[in-house]
Amino acid sequence: MTLGTAVSVAVALLATAAPADAFAATANTHHAAKKTASASSAKKKSVKAASEKSAKVASADAPRAKASRKRVTLASNVHGHRGAVRKVAFQPRRPTVGQAFGLHDTPDALALRSSVAYVVDQNTGEPLFDKNSHAVVPIASISKLMTSMVVLDSKAPMNEQIEVTDEDRDYEKNTGSRLSVGSVLSREDMLHIALMASENRAAAALSRYYPGGRPAFIAAMNAKAKALGMTDTHFENSTGLSSSNVSSARDLVKMVNAAYQYPMIRQFSTDRTYDVYTGKRNLVYNSTNALIRGNGSWDIGLQKTGFINEAGECLVMQATIHGRPMVMVLLDSFGKYSRFADAARLRNWLDAGGGERLTAANTANGGT
């Protein structure tokens, strides 16, 4: 899949909504239909208020159960019965770009749930596991690694105070944030929670405070990608909420290796928890990575999670396994915890010598 094709498909999927009449209710009389419509209209304000309240606690890496299917409830009077019959249906979630291209159907020896899986020896660059590493797909909040490098490359004062404004709200996906408009944090704190907790408004505010503003920031992201040789990569924003932020696993290895050279990115991305004061209240943020929050059995030097509907569940990280530093990329995984389970399967496979067997087979076949 090429870069241009991936962007086009992502835009098409975003524009295509599930059918509004996925489950139709019937009404026997015009009076019953009017009654139902009237009741629906009367509830509009309360439903809207509840929706806005729910959005405030949502995030790019929030629980997926509510986002996976849209609930549709319709009511009607049947055969003159006084009680309304309520019918409930669920509109299926639109496919990811990977699903649209059939990447989920690619078989692999470990039965991974990720459409894309790529493991590379960080020291030698040798591929140890490869599943669709050339595929160009949306990468969601993995984009924040590039965001962080551009922020640090700017050499802007890390103690400068940055205020969240209405411009930093997400009007594309309507995700919520714990950082309310008017919150003020230092550039360092914004970067910390953008990496560790995938805080979207923090990433958006960082791009707005860049010299030349947001357009200059996005240009710097793409220039950095080009300088790193990331030919399959394109960025449209600093948060990753745009499905037009795309890359391949091979390119993401280059980005992880580059980000690993920044001590602050290594530290911030692997912290388990962090407290900030917004000028209004204290907030406690936690890592979005279950492997970081777990029992400490992983030796992770850098990581970033990501999720939007078009990208599926994503994870990139640098980890040391059996004393061997590796870069692991998992994209378009299906199921909230599947990316972490896939990472565990890959580690177990490597522990059992899977990487060495693959290397030996490649050498015997004259491969690389």
Each model region followed by its residue ranges:
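Domain-terminus/edge residues, biased toward the C-terminal soluble/receptor-binding domains
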Residues: 230, 234, 240, 244-368
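N-terminal secretory targeting signals
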Residues: 1-113, 352-368
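Secondary-structure junction/capping motif
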Residues: 2, 174, 186, 213, ...
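Active-site-adjacent loops and short helices of periplasmic peptidoglycan-processing enzymes
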Residues: 75-250, 254-263, 321
